[in-house]
Amino acid sequence: MVNLNPKRSDEPVWWGLFGAGGTWFAMLTPVTILVLGILVPLGVIGPESMNYLRVAGFVTSIIGALFVIGSISMPMWHAMHRVHHGMHDLKFHTGTAGKIACYATAALATVLSIVFIFMI
């Protein structure tokens, strides 16, 4: 017998954010760390290219704002999904409260990154 009214899951939404965050973290975060954490301090990229006005101009553009928001929020969604499923794997069955705590943390980081970008 086929169930005509199956229970719908919200898991595809979380898996989508998990996958997008993992992709962002694997592909864009290392380049960002290389440029901002290694090349600029070593002087390979001149300090005049990273002055306040240029960086503020980039961050306040739509592409720059989306990049900064994505760099903060996407890895956070990935990490919180891992924490949620990691707790389950370690037999910490927190149920809905753990799920809400993990995903609310990621949502809070996303909202704060958006708010702080608009404060610049």
From Swiss-Prot:
Principal location class: membrane
Function: Anchors the catalytic components of the fumarate reductase complex to the cell membrane, binds quinones.
Entry similarity comment: Belongs to the FrdD family.
Any GO CC annotation of this UniProt entry: fumarate reductase complex
Protein name: Fumarate reductase subunit D
Keyword set, alphabetical order: Cell inner membrane, Cell membrane, Membrane, Transmembrane, Transmembrane helix
Keyword Membrane attributed: yes
NCBIfam families: PRK05470.1-1
GO molecular function, a single term: succinate dehydrogenase activity
Domain of life: Bacteria
A biological process from GO: fumarate metabolic process
Residues that span the membrane, as ranges: 25-45, 55-75, 100-120
Cell inner membrane keyword on record: yes
Compartmental location: Cell inner membrane
Description of how the protein assembles with itself and partners: Part of an enzyme complex containing four subunits: a flavoprotein (FrdA), an iron-sulfur protein (FrdB), and two hydrophobic anchor proteins (FrdC and FrdD).
Database matches in InterPro entries: Fumarate_red_D (IPR003418), SQR/QFR_C/D (IPR034804)
Membrane topology summary: Multi-pass membrane protein
Annotated organism of origin: Aliivibrio salmonicida (strain LFI1238) (Vibrio salmonicida (strain LFI1238))
Database matches in Pfam families: Fumarate_red_D
